[in-house]
Amino acid sequence: MINLNIFNILKYKLVRIIESNPTLNLLIYNNVRFFKFLLPHEKDYLGMKKICKNDVNATIIDVGANLGISTMGFREMGFKNNIYIYEPNYEIYKKYLKPLVKTYKKLHINNFALGDKNHTKNFYIPYYKGKPIHYFGSFNRSYIVNSIKITFPKLLLDIEIKKRKVRIQKFDSLKSK
């Protein structure tokens, strides 16, 4: 137990270092499926293991799944639940989420955002040196600018923010599969 606690402390310190450098962050997180020892990537998930029901008949919803790191974390912790994944960014959906279905069972991936009505909306993605910093993707452009000012203040002038149209589905209109 002590060795596991020491490992987790070191792991979460390493994750903070990774998250402080955009190039390293993208390199590691884009390839996290090869670094499963980093999962779950947040210690809060260990608490969720104590309070969430690990049941094949229960459901987990991963909204704004991005790379699917939370979903991978749940699977690496042993959760067998159905997981419904929602990610509006098509590039991430295609490159990172679709392959997860081959690795993990009972995943249901969807390439749209959830909302209170069916429509399309602008989705903003910052790019650094031509690479998307997808974890800052947002419907709110100023949120991205403020997040970068806080997280990577010296890089703000090197960031290009691109706009994409994405589909939003009304949450209560989704039909169960």
Model-derived regions, located:
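Phosphate/nucleotide-binding beta-alpha loop and adjacent structural elements of enzyme active sites
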Residues: 2-177
